[in-house]
A protein has these predicted regions:
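Acceptor-binding helix/loop patch of EC 2.4 sugar-transfer enzymes
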Residues: 293
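Flexible phosphate-sensing "switch/lid" loops adjacent to ATP/NTP-binding sites
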Residues: 1-144, 148-154, 159-248, 252-272, ...
């Protein structure tokens, strides 16, 4: 929306402290080669790649004073993108927080999620097209309880693939965003929803095919079953993810991660990417909120 207004937007992500922090003081990501240059993990790529796909430069690192000053040199508007790992390191002109009705109550029971909820000027309830009505109401009530002055926007999160017919009647492996499934507590993501929606014949259980640290992940997170978390906190784990995928007996891989996993591993099966977007329901919309910056 901001780009459509003609604004130059630069995103700043919260710290992803993997590897040698002394060489990560101020990192700039403008294209995919920068992800390789900085030896990004899958988890880092999941945060940076969607911005790059949208033509937005991303900064991250260690020294957030220096990062801010560098970002200011090339931006009209700076977007702090902290995920649910931090509240903003900077004083903001507008604070937008997204809440997930698939995890009702988490907005009050986790730090810094609760802090973000209380600080928000605008709160977006997404996934209302797939969430349970009672869970949506729980989230609404919790917002009213702790931040009644926030502007609330409700939205669907429609999913899409390039060719749904490729999935129909196929035996599939579903790969999902790792942190969402592990410490995020979710049992499924967009890939699983897509497999169901587009008529996969069977979603295989990847557990028997798991190797190394991927096998350990299943032992630690007992709620995981018909999905494979895209764990990749280093080259060794990426190879174990690749081996697990390649051992699986299926027709194709449905990837619900925010990245193109074929950039970092080499699956021996076709990979179909699932994408999702924000579809506001009713008014106000995000455009209404952001137009004051035009």
């Amino acid at each position: 929306i901001l780009k459509e207004m003609g604004k130059k937007v630069v995103a700043i992500r919260h710290p992803m402290p993997y590897g040698d922090l002394s060489i990560q003081v101020c990192q700039r990501f403008a294209d995919y080669s920068d992800l390789d240059k900085h030896k990004c993990t899958i988890e880092e790529r999941e945060e940076y790649e969607p911005h790059i796909d949208n033509g937005i430069i991303v900064y991250a690192g260690v020294d957030y004073e220096k990062i801010l000053r560098e970002a200011e040199k090339e931006a009209d508007i700076i977007l702090w993108d902290g995920g649910n790992n931090d509240f903003s390191f900077y004083h903001t002109d507008l604070y937008i927080v997204l809440v997930d009705p698939h995890r009702p109550g988490h907005e009050l029971s986790y730090h810094p999620g609760e802090v973000n909820l209380k600080m928000a000027d605008v709160i977006i309830i997404n996934k209302i097209d797939t969430a349970n009505a009672d869970d949506i109401n729980t989230v609404r009530q919790n917002i009213e309880k702790v931040n009644p002055n926030a502007l609330v926007i409700e939205a669907a999160s429609p999913i899409s693939v390039d060719d749904p017919d490729e999935i129909r009647n196929k035996k599939v492996l579903v790969v999902e965003d790792g942190p969402t499934l592990t410490h995020g507590g979710m049992a499924f993501g967009a890939g699983f929803v897509a497999a169901k929606k587009f008529g996969a014949k069977e979603i295989i259980n990847p557990k028997p095919y798991a190797v190394g640290s991927i096998k350990d992940t299943y032992q630690k997170y007992k709620h995981l079953s018909l999905i494979l978390p895209a764990m990749g906190y280093g080259q060794k784990q990426m190879k174990e993810l690749e081996e697990t995928i390649n051992r699986c007996e299926c027709d194709l891989v449905i990837s619900g991660t925010p990245i193109d996993i074929t950039r970092v591993i080499s699956p021996n099966k076709p990979v179909i990417r699932v994408k999702y977007s924000l579809q506001e329901i009713g008014n106000p919309t995000l455009y209404d909120v952001l137009k004051k910056f035009n």
